[in-house]
Amino acid sequence: MNLKILWMYHDLMDLYGDKGNAEVLRRRAEKRGIEVQLDTCTIGEEKNIDEYDLFFLGGGADKEQNLIFADLLQRKQSIQTAMDHKTAFLLICGGYQLFGQYYKDQDGNVIEGLKFFDYYTVAGNRDERCIGNIAVETTMDGKTFKAVGFENHGGQTKNVSTPF
């Protein structure tokens, strides 16, 4: 079995060490006998997103989100095609925000999103970040899974009505 991962904007959207997340994905798959191809893509590079099994987009500060947005917008139809063909997406932090309607920072500035989903994110109080281990249970395709991870965010995502 093979797994093709496309890590988008690896050079810009790596705020909290998403390189480690990509490497963990690779190693866990390889331990299960899955051959992994991990490719990167940044602004201006051509990749056929639909050829990948997993689209990975990490976190980035407001500056980096603004930098990549025009490039992401040019890829919107390709991303939609990949979604329609059941490509999996792992979106972290700013990557997640960019797939919603918008992100509003603490000064009221808005970074537009790709609008794939109904949600939007608003920056929270700088002194009230959500930081720590997290475990959630979810059901997908009739199977129940426990997802375990670490959260570190200050934004509040609202209007989550579109099923992922």
Regions found by a protein language model. Name each.
Residues 9-10, 41-43, 58-60, 92-95, ...:
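Fold-independent oxyanion-binding glycine-rich loops
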Residues 6-18, 46-49, 103-111, 144-153:
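Short low-complexity stretches enriched in small and charged residues
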Residues 12-15, 62-64, 121-124, 156-160:
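Short, acidic Gly/Pro/Ser/Thr-rich loop/turn segments
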Residues 30-34, 84, 119-122, 157:
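Generic secondary-structure signature for well-ordered alpha-helical cores
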Residues 62-137, 144:
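Cysteine-nucleophile active-site neighborhood
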Residues 1-81:
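N-terminal beta1-alpha1 cap of cysteine-dependent amidohydrolase-like domains
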Residues 2, 124-164:
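Amide-donor transfer/coupling interface in amidating biosynthetic enzymes
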Residues 25-34, 102-107, 159-164:
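Short charge-dense sequence patches
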